[in-house]
Amino acid sequence: MNGKLLALSLFSLSISHSVISAEINLYGTGGPHHALNEIVQKFKENDRFKDIKININPGPYTTWESCAKGLDKSCNTGPADILWGTSENYYAVLEDEFKKYGFTSKRSKSIYLRPAVILVQKGNPKHIHGIEDLINNPEVKRIVVNNHTLKSVMSATALWEDIVGRKGKLEDVEKFRSKIVYQASGSGTAAKAFLGNQQQEKTDAWITWPEWYHANTEKADMIEIEPDRVIYRDLNVSIKQGASEEATAFYDYLSSKEAFDIFQKYNIGK
């Protein structure tokens, strides 16, 4: 009897330790991480998952690639269980780069859409109401955009020219192009350029995604892009083959109504 009790006690301790030490690691580009962090807290309200550690690791691809692949043993978090991408061109990179690490298109899905928006300085001092103002308003002289560089991967690659060139007018592209003062290789650096500092003047506008407004509501206003010009990119997620039951549950939860309600707060929808 004592032996059985001891075995049962050790089994219970093992289960308890397993629940407490369970960990899910997500990696992806910055922006959606604001909503994801909030979704993690909502997910953990379920007693079944309250003790799980969920690590949201956002940033430029090159800053987390080796950690997500498990190649860098100095990383604070383990290899990726879930990857998120912020466009299909971004997903194509993830699919190609992580196919040796258990990620395939069969275990991925598009879950939401994000509209491109214009961020302007708080109070909208240049009275910007859409792309037409960025093109034709002579008072608008300093614009920052995101764009792909040789060592970067991003959802906003060629975004500005898709929007500005939407009507097939070369003149629109030429006018807008002449006002670009910085093409950033990531949203983090673009945000810094937009907001300015003691050494760098603020810009009048930044074409970006709505979650960057929600991260800077005290410093910026958000302007919607005209319906005949607005471009959307999807938010997609992929889960590793053989992922844990907990990781699979969170992956599924990202498509739930509860998660959707949170994403909507950041202007990410369907």
What function would you assign to each model-found segment?
Residues Q41-R48, I131-S185:
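Ligand-binding cleft/hinge of the Venus flytrap
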Residues M1-A7:
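Bacterial N-terminal signal peptides that target proteins for export
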Residues N89-S152, A156-L159:
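A conserved helix-loop-strand patch within extracytoplasmic ligand-binding domains
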Residues L113-P115, N146-H148, H214-D252, L254-K270:
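Periplasmic-binding protein-like
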Residues A22-L94:
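Early extracytoplasmic/lumenal segment of secretory-pathway proteins
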Residues W64, L159-P227:
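Ligand-binding pocket segment of bilobal, Venus flytrap-like solute-binding proteins
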